[in-house]
From Swiss-Prot:
Annotated spans, 5 X 4 AA repeats of P-X-X-P: 734-894
Protein name: Protocadherin alpha-1
Protein function: Potential calcium-dependent cell-adhesion protein. May be involved in the establishment and maintenance of specific neuronal connections in the brain.
Listed GO MF terms: calcium ion binding
Glycosylation sites: N257, N265, N548
Gene3D superfamilies: Cadherins (2.60.40.60)
Basic and acidic residues: compositionally biased ranges: 909-923
Source organism of the structure: Homo sapiens
Keyword Protein transport in annotation: no
């Protein structure tokens, strides 16, 4: 803008005021534009994007749009250049009628993030409406007797424009009789009068035709005309006169129908009929006034006949005419101004727009959820509206502009606590009494994967019988996820690990959807007592969340193993055992002992022995111990007894159903003077096919002696090497038993240790020597694994002979096959979390004092097949805590290990040997210097003797 220097200080002041005005508009947060009405389509209004500080490139992605409901189609924004333009015809008179100020209020909304801008477009009036009179002509009756300067009212024109465009000037066509007199009222309206300038003469001029022209102040000027038809009357020369030219009345918009508005008073100086006045509305009155009011023609009372509404029309201007009954009648006019007063009869209105739903439960605070617009048709305090939100919700209302509010997030959301919020927004005006309105906003909370699947308990215990069919269902795990939809879709899987040397997936599987756990193969209690593993539950969210649960599957024992007899094998099968018994032995003499084991556990492995009746019901002088299996005489044998007895011993376990095995014992009575070897040979000769066994035993003795000699040399060589080479730490650490379950809760060890069978000679294998090989722990370090084989090899690379401390004694080899004598039941717990099982216990008061006795394991964590044997009378004291027993039996196997050297001067009790009829004399041991070799040879000799006995 360029100012002339002539302007001086005035131009500077104008520039300063313009700058201050622009700064105020920017600070108010609203843009202001102005356009003339009737602008063509596409007319430029303003660069709204540039003025709002928005980039043109972000208009389309942010869905920049006009959101006003009332005037949305009048103006539009070009998203390509950000220009606000005229979209359809704008008529100021249609928008604002007679209002002096006319503006279009627009709401411009941009998403991501949500922003609201307010634009006010002022509509400028143009002179597009000419002045208009109500009719094409006005008829005026004027008596000829009227005096000069008499005035006669005429109706003016109306212009729909405002301002200068509605400022009317009137001109009257030239006339000798009348001139135009214009008066301006305080309501900015003009009253027109015809003033008589010359006496009328009806006979000379009965009618006059004048042209009244109204011209507005617009550019270009517009005009309107009306023809005035003046009829000159005779006689009645006094018109009615009102006591007031203008009547002013105020009515509440709630005024009831029939209420008296005002009473008009008019008088006529004439007498008689010429003085009677009749009231009526002017002929040019609007239809709206005729529907709202009525006037009594005789009394002049104006009454209300319809409801008023301040919001529709705030004031009424009523033209009332008083006409006398003279001939011709004379009339006069007055004006009644009715102002309608506002009453708080309109409740506020709420509109919820631009909902940003659903909202994520992890949405940040102050996130805009919705826009709320309030309005009230009342005015003043009755139209002032305040908004509020229901309490105790994580939302709040923020006033962004007059009558505009934003619903924003005030605190953190949790869909699992509440997934939908039903909000109530209340708008209340300032009237008395105040009116209010409510709007409900349903806010749905979208789920976020913030909850992992949870199991009902951290660990489950399952009991499964062994020998289950493959693929059987053993348990169902279930996890619940508090999230929704995909975030709550749980899938299950195994946490893979190894069970021994096999993968966990070889034993069990879990269905991914249902959580059912299946056993893929038959489980064997004798191989696996406890299977502990974890099942993982994972949801389908992004990122996925998961948790684990531990399953402890206890495999319950079934009676699926029959008792197995431990006896010498002939031709690969268990044959009959032949025993020689001297005649004339006393009652209770132990003839033989039937040895059997059962691979099951508990009552399924508790064996009892029964002697089957002889053929023909003959009585036999023998009996068998119910739980020991020892065959003894029931009386003193004499010459009358048979020389040979065939005894059938039935071995039966206590399972359901019970399984059995039968042992055959051939007892031959010989003279007491015969040597045991001769008796043995005689029995073998009687047996027939057993004669060849004697020769085998002879060769076996020779082989054992050779092996013993080689063992002594090996030990000497090994000792020399050990003295010359520093020992390697960890090379001789015994391995730990292989664990079925490797969890931190504790585990049960295998009841069946790994066994290695060693045969002393070629031919049919015999269980003469059982070497214990403990399973090595998988956690051994590399040096232990590398050095372990060196402990078992000599310098030549050949396997070394076993240590003499790990051999059997003759008594142990004989006693290891004996059954346990059980009298009462005790309780053995399988360790933490394991099942409680009833176990038989051992009584020290056995009826056979010479027989072997056992004590059951007591306390948690002891293997179910581990039993401590006691031999000989007197029931020796058991080893206390921290003491090592002299002998122990390998669980699940017939091997008994001697871990201590026998005392050199102690005698071996005869009850430690099972001679099956042969007496073994007591031998004294040499001193400790020569004790090892002598004892080793003696034990080998005893083994040979036992083999020959068998």
């Amino acid at each position: 803008m360029v100012f002339s220097r002539r302007g001086g200080l005035g131009a500077r002041d104008l520039l300063l005021w313009l700058l201050l005005l622009a700064a105020w508009e920017v600070g108010s947060g609203q843009l202001h534009y102005s356009i003339p009405e009737e602008a063509k389509h596409g007319t430029f209004v303003g660069r709204v994007a540039q003025d709002l500080g928005l980039e043109l490139a972000e208009l389309v992605p942010r869905l920049f749009r006009v959101a006003s409901k009332t005037h949305r189609d009048l103006l539009e924004v070009n998203l390509q250049n950000g220009i606000l333009f005229v979209n359809s015809r704008i008529d100021r008179e249609e928008l604002c009628q007679w209002s002096a100020e006319c503006s279009i209020h627009l709401e411009l909304i941009a998403d991501r993030p949500l922003q609201v801008f307010h634009v006010e477009v002022k509509v400028k009036d143009i002179n597009d409406n000419p002045p208009v009179f109500r009719g094409r002509e006005q008829i005026i009756f004027i008596p000829e007797s009227r005096l000069l300067n008499s005035r006669f009212p005429i109706e003016g024109a109306a212009d729909a424009d405002i301002g200068a465009n509605a400022l009317l000037t009137y001109t009257l066509s030239p006339s000798d009789y009348f001139s135009l007199d214009v008066e301006a009222s305080d309501e900015l309206s003009k009253s027109l009068w015809l003033e008589l300038r010359k006496y009328l003469d009806r006979e000379e001029t009965p009618e006059l035709h004048l042209l009244l022209t109204a011209t507005d102040g617009g550019k270009p000027e517009l005009q309107g005309t009306v023809e005035l038809l003046i009829t000159v009357l005779d006689v009645n020369d006094n018109a009615p006169l009102f006591d007031q030219a203008v009547y002013r009345v105020h009515l509440l918009e709630t005024t009831a129908n029939g209420t008296l508005v005002t009473t008009l008073n008019a008088s006529d100086a004439d007498e008689g009929v010429n003085g009677e006045v009749v009231f009526s509305f002017d002929s040019g009155i609007s239809r709206d006034i005729q529907e709202k009011f009525k006037v009594d023609s005789s009394s002049g009372e104006i009454r209300l006949i319809d409801k008023l509404d301040y919001e529709e029309t705030k004031s009424y201007e009523i033209q009332v005419k008083a006409v006398d009954k003279g001939s011709p009648p004379m009339s006069n006019h007055c004006k009644v101004l009715v102002k309608v007063l506002d009453v708080n009869d309109n409740a506020p209105e709420l509109a919820v727009t631009s909902l940003y739903l659903p909202i994520r439960e992890d949405a940040p605070l102050s996130t805009v959820i919705a826009l709320i617009t309030v309005s009230d048709r009342d005015s003043g305090a009755n139209g002032q509206v305040t908004c509020s939100l229901m309490p105790h919700v994580p939302f709040k209302l923020v006033s962004t502009f007059k009558n505009y509010y934003s619903l924003v997030l005030d605190s953190a959301l949790d869909r699992e606590s509440l997934s939908v919020y039903e909000l109530v927004v209340t708008a209340r005006d300032g009237g008395s009494p105040s009116l209010w309105a409510t709007a409900r906003v349903s806010v749905e909370v979208a789920d976020v994967n913030d909850n992992a699947p949870a199991f009902a308990q951290p660990e489950y215990t399952v009991f499964v019988k062994e020998n289950n069919p493959p693929g059987c269902h053993i348990f169902t795990v279930s996890a619940r996820d508090a999230d929704a939809q995909e975030n709550a879709l749980v899938s299950y899987s195994l946490v893979e690990r190894r069970v021994g040397e096999r993968a966990l997936s070889n034993y069990v599987s879990v269905h991914a959807e249902s959580g059912k756990v299946y056993a893929l193969q038959p489980l064997d209690h004798e191989e696996l007592e406890l299977l502990q593993f974890q099942v993982s539950a994972r949801d389908a969210g992004v990122p996925p969340l998961g948790s684990n649960v531990t399953l402890q599957v206890f495999v319950l024992d079934e009676n699926d193993n029959a008792p197995a007899l431990l006896a010498p094998r002939v031709g690969g099968t268990i044959g009959a055992v032949s025993e020689l018994v001297p005649r004339l032995v006393g009652a209770g003499h132990v003839v033989a002992k039937v040895r059997a084991v059962d691979a099951d556990s508990g009552y399924n492995a508790w064996l009892s022995y029964e002697l089957q009746p002889a053929a023909g019901g003959a009585r036999i002088p023998f009996r068998v111990g119910l739980y020991t299996g020892e065959i003894s005489t029931t009386r003193v044998l004499d010459e009358a007894d048979l020389s040979r007895y065939r005894l059938l011993v039935l071995v039966k376990d206590h399972g359901e159903p019970a399984l059995t095995a039968t042992a055959t014992v051939l007892v031959s009575l010989v003279e007491s003077g015969q040597a045991p070897k001769a008796s043995s040979r005689a029995s073998v000769g009687v047996a027939g096919p057993e004669a060849a066994l004697v020769d085998v035993n002879v060769y076996l003795i020779i082989a054992i002696c050779a092996v013993s000699s080689l063992l002594v040399l090996t030990l000497l060589l090994y000792t020399a090497l050990r003295c010359s080479v520093p020992p390697t730490e960890g090379a001789y650490v015994p391995g730990k038993p292989t664990l079925v379950c490797s969890s931190a809760l504790g585990s049960w060890s295998n009841s069946q240790q790994r066994r290695q069978r060693v045969c002393s000679s070629e031919g049919p294998p015999k269980t003469d020597l059982m070497a214990f090989s403990p399973g090595l722990s998988p956690s051994l370090n590399t040096s232990e694994r590398n050095e372990q084989p060196e402990a078992n090899l000599d310098l030549s690379g050949n396997p070394r002979q076993p240590n003499p401390d790990w051999r059997y004694s003759a008594s142990l080899r004989a006693g290891m096959h004996s059954s346990v004598h059980l009298e009462e039941a005790g309780i053995l717990r399988a360790g933490p979390g394991g099942p409680d099982q009833q176990w038989p216990t051992v009584s020290s008061a056995t009826p056979e004092p010479e027989a072997g006795e056992v004590s059951p394991p007591v306390g948690a964590g002891v293997n179910s097949n581990s039993w401590t044997f006691k031999y000989g009378p007197g029931n020796p004291k058991q080893s206390g805590p921290g003491e090592l027993p002299d002998k122990f039996i390998i669980p699940g196997s017939p091997a008994i290990i001697s871990i201590r050297q026998e005392p050199t001067n102690s005698q071996i009790d005869k009850s430690d040997f099972i001679t099956f009829g042969k007496k073994e004399e007591t031998k004294k041991k040499k001193k400790k210097k020569k004790g090892n070799k002598t004892q080793e040879k003696k034990e080998k000799g005893n083994s040979t003797t036992d083999n020959s006995d068998q």
